[in-house]
């Protein structure tokens, strides 16, 4: 008799994806972050669902409904902080996952990589809209400043902004539609994530050496399921430590003040995971130029596969490219720091230099390092 997991139409799909999946025998802990992102997504959908049961998307009551969740709803405070800090964990895993893809040359799986970049964009949009929902000062002004960037688009910009706002300023209509989109987008993300996996399983996973591993594969279960469970436990431990000891450390104190259109906060800044892009935006004095740089800072990921010049796929045996990669990581950390600083000397010039370095590394220095390494190895 055939095993049910191999014959049942539905269970068969799960079996081929998570149980009998042939997996390279040498993938390291850097490959754990895909499953961690899946766990983060499930956690965000579940906590978000329970928050949506008590939240009211109305300018008059949104702020107090969040306070009500924290004070009056059973375990509402932990649900709210799991959701808020879960987003931070999501982005930490996401940045590591993308970094892994760049380091080990996983971007050569074009479809998987492109869907991943679309996923990144969708996630950023979802997180931005979620930040607006508590309707604190930073929520309101963040929404105003970021949506206003679209007015830099020639000819249609102003109309586009007013269309998104649903009026002449960020108001009730904006909050309602942001809540609607924030609710629906995670399900779209889930569909995209399944497509991402579908394309990945067409080619099979990459591995640290970047060499095809078809002759040396092992079943996903039990070897990698147990490894993933360890990663999940560590993620939950880190998240709970954050939620139970310092839940507000990554937030902005200004968001505990109800939104007031008549009073601008001294420093408007987004959540920490957008600060690198925000720093790039601010480093260009021209509005349209800044918006273009902001969009290109993420869109450059789409052209990375076409800038791969090395004869080797992975950076595992390429010390020069490794230096460039870690310089890029340091540069992104610098940009994140600059994004949270006021616009004054010396932060302006540091931000501009870091922004130039970011694009130079991706578009010029990393491809150049690949060419130099090929020549050194006489390939």
From Swiss-Prot:
Membrane topology according to the record: Multi-pass membrane protein
Species this protein is from: Ceratotherium simum (White rhinoceros)
Family annotation (PANTHER family): CYTOCHROME B
KW Membrane (keyword) present: yes
Biological processes per GO annotation: mitochondrial electron transport, ubiquinol to cytochrome c
Annotated binding of heme b b566, by residue: 97, 196
Subunit structure of this chain's protein: The cytochrome bc1 complex contains 11 subunits: 3 respiratory subunits (MT-CYB, CYC1 and UQCRFS1), 2 core proteins (UQCRC1 and UQCRC2) and 6 low-molecular weight proteins (UQCRH/QCR6, UQCRB/QCR7, UQCRQ/QCR8, UQCR10/QCR9, UQCR11/QCR10 and a cleavage product of UQCRFS1). This cytochrome bc1 complex then forms a dimer.
Residues binding a ubiquinone: 201
Compartment(s) of residence: Mitochondrion inner membrane
Assigned keywords, A-Z: Electron transport, Heme, Iron, Membrane, Metal-binding, Mitochondrion, Mitochondrion inner membrane, Respiratory chain, Transmembrane, Transmembrane helix, Transport, Ubiquinone
Protein family (similarity comment): Belongs to the cytochrome b family.
One Pfam family per UniProt: Cytochrome_B
Protein name (database record): Cytochrome b
